């Protein structure tokens, strides 16, 4: 009995290829997916509904006293930043093995890691979908640049932690400029794109980003309110090289106690209290306060140099500094 070879035309037939859905079928599948929107967004919406200070939105409003962009574009930028900020928190909490966020269980402990990662990634693209409303294709370029910057900074931070490598202060500042500064810069660059004012606030925003992060690092180890919201000394449990920890380790390289505690990822309160005393003994908390004061002075100097091009700048920068938890200095 003879057998015939397969017909190559049949094997290559378009019938065997996946065809795009058309007409009613496409609408049906779209409708089904739309019905899952709340489920897909659930980890994100849970985080969004937790009480927060909404600092970034308030800062955008404060800077708009100078940039005066139209209200509709201002709301678009606020939405973009809100989506990105909360998406990054979802990912941060997973990468840091966090347990609490704003005093309640983190999203991935409720919805699971896979669903939470998907919700965070979904939010990145919801934010990107807002960009055409700004009416300038350069918005996509800014968005991509700053998201790449944010992920570079996050990668540096994670590497130091996982490799138990204590960075220098200069490396820390570079990381913060990318990670924390990225979202601040994204907001201000999109605002400048939408404004007819000729002001460059990026240098100021870079300084504010560093102030914000050092303050956060300080409060993580010294604030009762922070303990309630995120747990006591969470940075120690994460093994994170925060600003006071970096200063303390580098102030006394022969003392390996603090670096050893970081490697343990301890949840023991007594061990963490001992670590805080080690940090205090090297004057590292005072160093934080001194560095913040120095950076606040630098921010004020940047405003001063802008001169008359930014009317009312002194009062506005006080409001911005106040928003990130610093009392305005008396002049």
From Swiss-Prot:
Name the UniProt record assigns to this protein: Geranylgeranyl pyrophosphate synthase dpmaD
Cofactor(s) named in the record: Mg(2+)
Gene Ontology terms, MF aspect: (2E,6E)-farnesyl diphosphate synthase activity; dimethylallyltranstransferase activity; geranylgeranyl diphosphate synthase activity; metal ion binding
The keyword Translocase belongs to this UniProt entry's keyword annotation: no
Any GO BP: mycotoxin biosynthetic process
Residues holding dimethylallyl diphosphate: 101, 179-180, 213, 220, 230, 240
Catalyzed reactions per annotation: isopentenyl diphosphate + dimethylallyl diphosphate = (2E)-geranyl diphosphate + diphosphate; isopentenyl diphosphate + (2E)-geranyl diphosphate = (2E,6E)-farnesyl diphosphate + diphosphate; isopentenyl diphosphate + (2E,6E)-farnesyl diphosphate = (2E,6E,10E)-geranylgeranyl diphosphate + diphosphate
Chain sites annotated for binding Mg(2+) 1: 92, 96
């Amino acid at each position: 009995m003879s057998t015939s070879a397969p017909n190559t035309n049949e094997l290559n037939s378009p019938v065997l290829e996946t065809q795009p859905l058309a007409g009613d079928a496409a609408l049906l599948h779209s409708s089904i997916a739309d019905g899952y929107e709340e489920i897909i967004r659930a980890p994100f919406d849970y985080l969004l509904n937790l009480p927060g200070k909404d600092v970034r939105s308030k800062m955008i409003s404060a800077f708009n006293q100078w940039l005066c962009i139209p209200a509709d574009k201002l709301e678009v930028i606020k939405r973009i930043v809100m989506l990105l900020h909360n998406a990054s928190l979802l990912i941060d909490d997973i990468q840091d093995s966090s347990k609490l966020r704003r005093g309640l269980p983190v999203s991935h402990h409720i919805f699971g890691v896979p669903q939470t990662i998907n919700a965070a990634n979904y939010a990145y693209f919801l934010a990107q979908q807002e960009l055409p409303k700004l009416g300038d294709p350069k918005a996509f370029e800014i968005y991509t640049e700053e998201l790449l910057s944010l992920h570079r900074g996050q990668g540096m931070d994670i590497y130091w932690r996982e490799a138990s490598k204590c960075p220098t202060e200069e490396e820390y500042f570079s990381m913060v400029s990318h990670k924390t500064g990225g979202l601040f810069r994204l907001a201000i660059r999109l605002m400048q794109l939408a404004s007819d004012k000729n002001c460059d606030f990026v240098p100021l925003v870079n300084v504010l980003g560093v102030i914000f992060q050092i303050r956060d690092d300080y409060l993580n180890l010294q604030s009762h309110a922070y303990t309630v919201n995120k747990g006591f000394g969470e940075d120690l449990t994460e093994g994170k090289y925060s600003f006071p920890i970096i200063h303390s380790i580098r102030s006394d390289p022969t003392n390996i106690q603090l670096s050893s505690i970081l490697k343990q990822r301890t949840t023991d309160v007594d061990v963490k209290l001992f670590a805080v005393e080690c940090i205090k003994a090297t004057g590292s908390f005072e160093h934080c306060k001194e560095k913040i004061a120095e950076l606040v002075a630098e921010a004020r100097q940047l405003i001063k140099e802008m001169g008359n091009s930014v009317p009312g700048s002194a009062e506005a920068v006080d409001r911005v500094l106040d928003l990130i938890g610093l009392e305005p200095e008396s002049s």
